[in-house]
Curated annotation (Swiss-Prot):
GO terms for molecular function: ATP binding; metal ion binding; methionine-tRNA ligase activity. This is Methionine--tRNA ligase. GO terms for biological process: methionyl-tRNA aminoacylation. InterPro entries: Anticodon_Met, Met-tRNA_ligase_1, Met-tRNA_synth, Methionyl/Leucyl_tRNA_Synth, MetRS_core, MetRS_Zn, Rossmann-like_a/b/a_fold, tRNAsynth_Ia_anticodon-bd. Its cofactor is Zn(2+). Coiled coil: none annotated. It comes from Streptomyces avermitilis (strain ATCC 31267 / DSM 46492 / JCM 5070 / NBRC 14893 / NCIMB 12804 / NRRL 8165 / MA-4680). The gene is metG. A motif ('HIGH' region) lies at residues 11-21. One of its GO terms (cellular component) is cytosol. Its EC number is 6.1.1.10. Zn(2+) binds at C143, C146, C156, C159. Binds 1 zinc ion per subunit.
Amino acid sequence: MARHLITSALPYINGIKHLGNMVGSMLPADVYSRYLRQRGHDVLYICATDEHGTPAELAAKERGLPVDEFCAQAHDAQKAVYDGFELAFDYFGRSSSEQNREITQHFARRLNENGFIEERAIRQVYSPADGRFLPDRYVEGTCPHCGYDKARGDQCENCTRVLDPTDLINPRSAISGSTDLEVRETKHLFLLQSKLQHEVEEWVARHEEEWPQLASSIARKWLNEGLHDRAITRDLDWGVPVPADTWPELAAEGKVFYVWFDAPIEYIGATKEWSDLDPENRDWKSWWYDADSGENPVRYTEFMAKDNVPFHTVMFPATELGVREPWKKVDYVKAFNWLTYYGGKFSTSQKRGVFTDHALEILPADYWRYFLIANAPESDDSSFTWEHFTATVNKDLADTLGNFVNRVLSFSKKRFGEEVPAGAPAGESETKLGEEIAALLAEYESHMETLQFRKAAAALRALWSAGNSYLEEKAPWLEIKTNPEGAALTLRTAMNLIHLYSVVSEPFIPASSKAMRSAFALSEDTATWVTQDEAKSLDSVPAGTPFTVPPVLFAKITDEDLESYKERFGGAPE
């Protein structure tokens, strides 16, 4: 059986992330990881904060902190939010770790030995006002391709084109805002991607048919435009230093590796961080080195937003290929479009949009987890609106699932006491229901296996709806007047549906799923996946099992709540 290695694109260290960041990489990876674990697979889910480069230095400067101290605090703050969202990382590391430094420097040495790194003198932007060379992200200006006036010197976030700072129109310093910029000569290391173009093309060709269209089209676009040699070092104070044993002159000048060189390597570095915590029982290399062979090969799935696709499908594979060592390369790239806020961008400065820490202040994580996955921007951009969020939570979670659980358990307790009633043997309605549930479960599983999250959410919702339809058809509140045994059967069947829901809903809404399972006094709280036979029989909770009525799973969002959220976070543009 394959082992599953799963990574999310590393969140930048420079602040708490918004809902778009959450649904674009971390949340779907967590949903998929949870599902695979429930199915009995060996799963390793790795993520980390991306701590090097311009964002870290700028954010630390704004806070008046040394950059290492800022990163330590920001890492802990992000980790607390992700814990609140119940993201079940096996390990959440830091790209500033010693492990990442060692592996990044190893990669650089190997690339150099194999003839894929070259030292070049280049002309780079220098700011007299700041007294320093300005790395890519320190330069802002207008994109020459799309005209976006807040493009950075490394990439335009509007059109996703990769840039050099000298490409920008009307460039300015991101530190001081000064437009008095000069171009001076400095030396840097270049990764000779042009020499690896053919190998990367062959590698992409072997995988792109399996990838979603979004990922494969971006990778192919980059390859068609040709891979260019790119500088992989920067003039920064914070980063993985260039090793002095290989490049003594550059090391003496304080050069560090470009953040997009060391950040993907941190997937490996974080795995070693995890392994080093328990080296007798964890083997990081078995997940990354020569991991395609043996009885339990690794299948590697990456999750990211579309702006990260070029780096993961072209640049990092080129690095791995050039090292000439059997490092594991990605098998499946799950890419996402943008989640917008009323059709526009999330903005911290303009106080527009919901950031993850604030989201947890007003509502439990399961509300957000379900809505975001059910509306994940898979085939196109999707828009968050408070009206849509409220309607989804109230209809799907409060009415369809939460109300079903409360109605069944409350009514059964009132009429039959605090144990699951026995009632009559299963009849035609129960047989029909079991077949319907098994079919819907198979559909749900199919979508989860192929990482189609919106479709999986729709199938999960259909499972919940099937229970409501069964309850309305049988109407135990009427049935009990003339056929108490039949009413008991209906409630016993419905309680088994609740337990089934608690298992299959676990990837989406883990806290609520646990609350549903905890309602039944079973021997253990098991979330082991439901088989087709178990789905058909609906008898995992036997008659006589004690149960309790849990607190309301999902409180409805009122009109007053809706207006207060829009006032706090901003609503539709006027």
